């Protein structure tokens, strides 16, 4: 996967794809490759990316052979939306809007697919957002979710990598909380049955509340998703054939629930 202008000028692309750390760069390239592979089925569809960041994923998707007919990137900050709109102004079919615009009635059932990458782990309240996704999706619409693995052996590897990256002055991890030995032990043996440690809540400069990665339990999220959507496929990244219990991120491909019982 090549990263070209104006993609590489995006804020996240600069610190992820173009990171001085080979491990960070490789991991994010592979994460996007897995996601783009899953999103190929959205060819000719209308797609929304909730929490699109700098727009890199949508731009790459629109440049692929199996690209959507139209793609809409959504963010909460006006300056981010303006930056994305300016950098991708020549990309046909790609637009960006503020999150508040999704409340307009014309967006109900307007999308064949909703993508949400590395967002849900930061949400203090996830259920209302899932309800909104269901409202935005048309009949049998698809939901593509990716979240980080912050439990089990991957957590130990990530914490070591974060410390090393911080020591080298690479990347920025605002709001990243440290773990006590007891919290690490609980995180190693976390399950889908209960929240294993208390998650810290931070407040942004704008007054919004959010979680960092500490204590995020992807297994509990999977259970929550399966109560509202039908789970079609689970994939790991950066290595797609790995079990999520040994991976850095996990992808869920789901379908809007029309009465089926999710496995």
What are the residue ranges of the model-derived segments?
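S-adenosyl-L-methionine-dependent methyltransferase catalytic module, highlighting the catalytic core
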Residues: 3-30, 79, 100-103, 124-138, ...
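Conserved SAM-binding loop
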Residues: 32-155, 250-259
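Short, intrinsically disordered terminal tails adjacent to the first/last structured region
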Residues: 262-263
């Amino acid at each position: 996967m090549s990263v070209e202008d104006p993609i590489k000028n995006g804020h996240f692309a600069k610190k992820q794809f173009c990171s001085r750390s080979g491990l960070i760069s490789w991991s994010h390239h592979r994460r996007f490759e897995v996601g783009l592979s899953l999103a190929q089925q959205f060819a000719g569809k209308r797609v929304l990316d909730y929490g699109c960041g700098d727009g890199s994923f949508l731009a790459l998707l629109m440049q692929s052979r199996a690209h959507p007919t139209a793609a809409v990137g959504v963010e909460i900050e006006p300056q981010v939306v303006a930056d994305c709109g300016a950098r991708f102004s020549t990309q046909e079919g790609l637009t960006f809007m503020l999150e508040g615009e999704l409340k307009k009635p014309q967006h109900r059932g307007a999308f064949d697919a909703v993508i949400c990458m590395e967002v849900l782990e930061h949400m203090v309240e996830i259920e209302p957002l899932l309800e909104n996704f269901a409202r935005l999706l048309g009949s049998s619409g698809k939901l593509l979710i990716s979240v980080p693995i912050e439990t089990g052996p991957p957590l130990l590897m990530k914490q070591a990598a974060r410390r090393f990256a911080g020591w080298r002055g690479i990347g920025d991890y605002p709001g990243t909380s440290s773990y006590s030995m007891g919290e690490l032990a609980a995180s190693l043996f976390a399950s889908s049955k209960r929240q294993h440690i208390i998650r810290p809540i931070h407040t942004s400069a704008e007054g919004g509340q959010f979680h960092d990665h500490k204590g995020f339990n992807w297994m509990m999220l999977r259970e929550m998703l399966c109560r509202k959507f039908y789970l079609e496929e689970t994939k790991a990244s950066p290595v797609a054939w790995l079990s999520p219990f040994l991976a850095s991120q996990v992808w869920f491909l789901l379908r809007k629930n029309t009465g089926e019982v999710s496995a």
